[in-house]
Amino acid sequence: MKRKVQKIIDEAPLEENSPPRFFDSDVEADSKPNDLTAANSIVDLKTNSQHENANAAGKEYGDSGVSESWVLDFLSVTGEKTISEFLAQKIWKTSNGDLNVAVDMYFDESFNIKNSNPDSESQKDTDASLTQMDQLSNTVSVKDLSINRNTNKKALNAVSPSLNLSSNSSVQDVSIDKEEMMKKQSRNALTPLDFIMKKNELMKYIGCFGVEAYSTASGTRTLQAGERIYLERQKLSIKSQSRNSRKKSKLLSINSSCYSNIVRFCNSDHHEIGKLPTEVASVISTLMEQGFWSFEAICIYSDNIIRFGSNVTLQVYCFINVNHPSLNRSPFTLATNSMQEEEEHLKASFAQNKRDHLLRLFTWIALEPDLEDCNTKESIHIDDILKTSSLPEARDESNSDLTPSSTEDEEDVVSDQLAILYDKVKTSGAELPSAPKPSTFALDLREYQKQALYWMCCKEEGVQSDGSAPKLHPLWSRFRFPKDSEFPEFFKCSSDDDNTHFYVNLYTGETTMLFPNSMPYHRGGILADEMGLGKTIEVLSLIHSRPCFSTDEIPEAFRHSKPSLPVASRTTLVVAPMSLLDQWHSEACKVSQGTKFRSMIYYGSEKPLDLKSCVIDTSTAPLIIITSYGVLLSEFSQQSHSSGLFSVHWFRVVLDEGHNIRNRESKTAKACHSISSQNRWVITGTPIVNKLDDLYSLIKFMRYEPWCNYTYWQTFVSLPYQSKDVLKALNVVQSILEFLVLRRTKETKDRNGNSIVTLPPKTVKIEYLDFSDSERKIYDSLYTKAKSTVNANIVAGTLFRNYTTILGLLLRLRQACCDPVLLSNMTINSETFDDFEFSVEQFNSLINQFVVTGKPIPSDILKIDTLKSFEALITECPICCNEPIQNPLLLNCKHACCGDCLSEHIQYQKRRNIIPPLCHTCRQPFNEQDVYKPFFVKNNGTQSTLLVGEEVKWKYWNRLQSVKLNGLLGQLRQLTHSSEPEKVVIFSQFTTFLDIIADVLESEKMGYARFDGTMSQQMRSTALETFRNDPDVNVLIISLKAGGVGLNLTCANHVFIMDPWWSWSVEAQAIDRIHRLGQEKPVFVTRYIVRDTVEERMLKIQERKNFITGTLGMSEGKQQVQSIEDIKMLFEY
């Protein structure tokens, strides 16, 4: 039981939950070990009778000559049941009968006494160690070391020769060989922290704090008030280090520490007195690992008689060696991508631990940042930062109810928060100087584009973009060394006035004496101008301004490139979506003057056989190489560095539509992160789509330290935002955006208060349409079934369990609003129509009325294209004898009749089972699907059924067209048949609907081009070129996803959006393909919406700026609640 007491006293600091003991500590006496009194009485008894125990009369322990009573006392303290005669003799002889020394030797692993065995091979070393200790004890008695405080300095030099003590002592000097021997064989686990001013050390005092330590020794007048205290860290034994797991070994290799977190303290005679509490010891030990921190202490109060576990009040003084190399090097380092994710996490964990302990120290010494001359007057509260600390005692209890899942799913950012983030970026961009247009650049640049060029050049050259003096980096804080420092004179400390400040990154724990410039040490940035402002032109102007490395940049390029990678010194790599490759190529050719500025597409069959040789030869290397994300991913998966995109160190890499890599775990993002480049740029109008983590992947591509480390990002951005500390997270992100991002919108004002760009007016109107009777029947049948399904799931509480089914029903309803033909491949069973007024056959019959087979109208029918030739056919109806024929219809045999007459004729023959029906004139059979109806085009391009106009056209009689197709065709005829035809862009999210529109355009003989995701890059390029340059092609049908971003379609000025999307921003992006820089005509936008359908209710959801798949600014639970409300709104529940 008494051994247990000793172990508790000696090893309690290893327990992380041990509370610190400060001056105001409320630790009561009864919180000490229960058997402490018994242990103290035993030790005190032995301390006061050491010599007597060594020579006590009584029964000896075997033949060893050791007193049995001494052995019993030793066993009672150590807790051992038995001890070998050999070991007892050795311990007793070496300790000279001093029970205190014997117990310390027994529990000190460096002596390896517990494993002593006279028959083992290792015993020789143990015997030698004990023999040497025995020889020393004969020269300097342990009794003198423990009791005679006036004659023990020389002896302590023998025990620990590294201590520089005075040699004025009456004790006989110890020879050098014994001193060296003792240096190896004494307490290796203790390393003294002597405060010795070495040649290059310059110590500066920063503060002090008080702490209540506790003793592990006992004695009378061992400490005095005001006495100097020495602090010693305990080394990790080899055995302890070997027990570490693989992960801990990696962390130790990063930390390079061979010390534990135990810190002992000794008196001025270097006699160990006790230990510091766990928290204080952990802080001091962790900071000491950095090499430039030093700690000294004095005794404030100690009992005259110290016992095991007695409280000792100390004052600890903190110093920094301002000449230490680690404090005088750049606080920024270039990020590399070679570190494995596990090692990166371990390194970040160690750095965060270092930061937490540093901030804890600052709170103890009441050290606050110096706000004078800083770029912010806002106070930085260290306690607030510690709320995200890894230290258990630093966590805020108010956040203790966060579940693991709640910390994994980051909440979305609301639009108001995005506006706050971008506001400062836009403000700083308005005051930028302008750069001159490059001489090789063929186009003129607007003023805001020249400002962007200046900003980008500054980013690549590493200079301050506003020309002002460097500012303190917003993540760093300046601290002032205390001027009036009161501490004992025996602490050697510099009082020079040259070093008045030091700098600390309160988010990472890094410390430096150098000024942390706000200009980061990376090359590149994020060009985030709003869509339509000409980001492509701005980047091309940068390429012409800085086409290659400058002379002083080449050594840096080779230093920062991956091993063995050649440098492509004059080539910029542009990575873009496949749909934009041709646009980049054409724009690059258009702006370049001279053949030496050539660009090349690296895609498909156009890829050169040897890209490395192509780009490293400066005489033939292209200025720009354009490739797709797909090609980059494909070569990344091959892991080949001998050829291809990953075989060189590029001068510049540009990611167009860079938000495509916002998922850091995607393979595309990892491919982009791995490419080697000197300058890195991201082009995106939406650097943050929904979540703050969207920005992280872009920052990792930029290799912007330290935020490209995900653990840092998560600790200081993601977790605070999730814990509702939104303002602090946004402040950090804003400080990052301020230096990385340039963003302007169409409403941004220049320095004169005028808009930076003036575009033609844009008119957006919603055209509400009404279903035909057949369409209404189809839609209502689907809506009724869908609504009953939703209601049943809401009542049963299984809505989210059947979420996919609900979304499928919504999809069918939206397709029914476009055209019933989209439902032709719908799987329908009889149970679906159990509650309806018609059967499956009737439902399919309704849909078949709208099915367009795509079969063209016969050419001999199309030849009847004039009013004169048409009137020759409709003189008199052969059925009703009306003259002329009313609502004429024409059969394949070119016999005409009234429309009503033909309908009755077909029904009559069906009743008589005459199938197929026979022509009313020549009695030839005909297919009722091959009946044609004329329409007439007026001079203004409108359609009419009257016999007026200049041109006759034909269409199928019984082929119904959806209400949206009828509305679209009516407007297209006006636009394409006018004296000056205008080009039109038609957007739809359904490619099958684009197929139907294409069939109608073909039947109308309207020239059109098509652009969607199913087409190859070459087909897309051809389609865009045809639409822009062919005067006979005035219509472009395009899918919302494939053509919603990046394209330049300013040749058109009319936009038709056939179906709404859940988010208005997606439609707005599509409109900006037309209403953008370069548009010279007013833009007219028409959005088709069918009344009394889900489309009309989708507009209300758009106005609320959130929906099922992406509710902004809500937790996962709140998103589900909001989704239920949206579904109820859609189905009018």
From Swiss-Prot:
Keywords: ATP-binding, Cytoplasm, DNA damage, DNA repair, DNA-binding, Helicase, Hydrolase, Metal-binding, Nucleotide-binding, Nucleus, Phosphoprotein, Repeat, Zinc, Zinc-finger. The modification Phosphoserine is found at residue 18. It is an enzyme of class 3 (hydrolase). Residues 971-1125 form the Helicase C-terminal domain. It is found in: Cytoplasm; Nucleus. It holds the Pfam family SNF2-rel_dom. It comes from the Eukaryota. A zinc finger (RING-type) spans 877-923. Its EC number is 3.6.4.-. PANTHER family: DNA REPAIR PROTEIN RAD5, TRANSCRIPTION TERMINATION FACTOR 2-RELATED. Probable helicase, member of the UBC2/RAD6 epistasis group. Functions with DNA repair protein rad18 in error-free postreplication DNA repair. Involved in the maintenance of wild-type rates of instability of simple repetitive sequences such as poly(GT) repeats. Plays a role in surviving topoisomerase-mediated DNA damage. This is DNA repair protein rad8. It comes from Schizosaccharomyces pombe (strain 972 / ATCC 24843) (Fission yeast). The lineage of its organism: Eukaryota, Fungi, Dikarya, Ascomycota, Taphrinomycotina.
